[in-house]
Amino acid sequence: MDKIRNFCIIAHIDHGKSTLADRLLEFTNTIQVTEGQMLDDMDLEKERGITIKSHAIQMEYTYKGEKYILNLIDTPGHVDFSYEVSRSIAACEGALLIVDASQGVQAQTISNLYMAIEHDLEIIPIINKCDMASAMPEEVEDEIVELLGCKRDEIIRASGKTGMGVEEILAAVIERIPHPQGDESAPLQALIFDSVFNSFRGIIAYFKITNGVIRAGDKVKFFNTGKEYVADEIGVLKMEMVPRKELRTGDVGYIISGIKTSKEVKVGDTITHVARPCDKAIAGFEEVKPMVFAGVYPIEAEEFEDLRASLEKLQLNDASLTFQPESSLALGFGFRCGFLGLLHMEIVQERLDREFDMNVITTVPNVSYHIYDKQGNMTEVHNPGGMPDPTMIDHIEEPYIKASIITTTDYIGPIMTLCLGKRGELLKQEYISGNRVELFYNMPLGEIVIDFYDRLKSISKGYASFDYHPDGFRPSKLVKLDILLNGESVDALSTLTHFDNAYDMGRRMCEKLKELIPRQQFEIAIQAAIGAKIIARETIKAVRKDVTAKCYGGDISRKRKLLEKQKKGKKRMKQIGNVEVPQKAFLAVLKLD
């Protein structure tokens, strides 16, 4: 056990953790030199250059004549996946903190770092990409020293591209990170930190043993669900899975026991023996709560069941996705899905498209609201269509977040303007180093879900980074904004918005829809309404044929007769005609600027 080291890598998006991980794997001869990131195995992860799922891999390394086992648990860096990070961190004793030499400390670096410090991990700071021309290792060292309070000589300079500093990192992992603690003779206690779905073997759970021993064929049970299984196969994770007869305290491995549904494997759950269970679960397990909700509808109504099957399969290795059936007048049957955030939502959409070939329409994303009626009863609403009658409502509460934005001093003005427009209130600002500031805001989550992140990046030329934590619910003056096409409400376009922004938003939505809905044979009125009050209107004129073309010279009354006839026809058409709203329109409404 004292020859095992479990560690993870903490970094902001794009600071090069997956590349550096590749170098560590090559150096310890775990893999041959290959193309691209080994640990990001989804196509989507490689394309976007982000890590979505946590991964684990075991390396063997001989140091000063002794053989050590190093378990690297890779973590995602994006704010949407912070629960994945927290579970990976809980399975480790140490962490490599990677900071980009040209970008310095970013918001997510800090939030994941605090998580690691809460779990008492040994932190090894590394400055990556030191071979770049734009690298500023001295300034970044100052920031790290100020952040961690460590000594300068504890910071390792490295480069994932050239492989510089890799040997020092491995030496530091062995010397500075403590070996796992635990008692082999105690009852089995193991933490699940990830699960993947394999269509032949069912669900494979990855775990780390904190106490006890597990052998193949043991009867085990999962603590929080209380279900029992037989451990058909256990083993360790190298580039592929290597079966073993037994795993002992401190080991990181996998278990296959023919589990078919993801709901039974909850990440953060504890595995123990049926015959000799441990007293209590490992602390820190929490159900992941989705933050952003959107309707997902199949384009063809008969694909509803296929969509359900696809979502269930996605849920197998993405436990944070939730969904329940709902129906909409405009779009038919579909699902109301809960996501961790906007990136997560985009990824789920892309995976539906790529892995299951499903074409879907997604509605405007929104958050969950607490609605109190006059009697003081609370209902939770994820969907503007579920809003009760406005006369019954006493007040509405919406979720708030505490946001931290790190930026250079040049962009403070525009960023503050953006946050004010999103109803944010500045709590405080702190200077991290000479020209970098951290701004703390309280903001409604609903204002952020649509385009906040994109706009923050474009205002600050990509220099601002953003991170947030939920901060409870607060009362707010919200109204339901409906969009009517020819007097019929399109429920998929309804949104809940703050009263102060409603007029502006209604006007912009009408203008946007006017551009996107194709002209029909009859005229279309696009209206935005709050309750019964119309607040904005645009009209799409009808396409019409020149019916008087065949009258040469001729009498005006003859022409008038033909025009009247055409007008009647158009009127009749308008009564029975329905308006096709293209998918583009649903998406464009999300990104109003």
Swiss-Prot record:
Role of this protein: Required for accurate and efficient protein synthesis under certain stress conditions. May act as a fidelity factor of the translation reaction, by catalyzing a one-codon backward translocation of tRNAs on improperly translocated ribosomes. Back-translocation proceeds from a post-translocation (POST) complex to a pre-translocation (PRE) complex, thus giving elongation factor G a second chance to translocate the tRNAs correctly. Binds to ribosomes in a GTP-dependent manner.
Protein name per its UniProtKB record: Elongation factor 4
Family: Belongs to the TRAFAC class translation factor GTPase superfamily. Classic translation factor GTPase family. LepA subfamily.
Binding-site list for GTP: 14-19, 128-131
Keyword field: Cell inner membrane, Cell membrane, GTP-binding, Hydrolase, Membrane, Nucleotide-binding, Protein biosynthesis
SUPFAM superfamilies named in the record: EF-G C-terminal domain-like, P-loop containing nucleoside triphosphate hydrolases
Species: Bacteroides fragilis (strain ATCC 25285 / DSM 2151 / CCUG 4856 / JCM 11019 / LMG 10263 / NCTC 9343 / Onslow / VPI 2553 / EN-2)
UniProt topology in membrane: Peripheral membrane protein
Catalytic activity annotation: GTP + H2O = GDP + phosphate + H(+)
Biological process annotations from GO: positive regulation of translation
A GO term for molecular function: translation elongation factor activity
HAMAP family xrefs: LepA
Residue ranges of domain tr-type G in the record: 2-181
A Pfam family reported for this protein in Swiss-Prot or TrEMBL: GTP_EFTU
InterPro entries: EF-4, EFG_III/V, EFG_V-like, EFTu-like_2, LepA_C_sf, LepA_CTD, LepA_IV, P-loop_NTPase
Entry-linked PROSITE patterns: G_TR_2 (PS51722)
Protein EC: 3.6.5.n1
Enzyme class at the top of the EC tree: hydrolase
Localization: Cell inner membrane
One GO CC annotation: plasma membrane
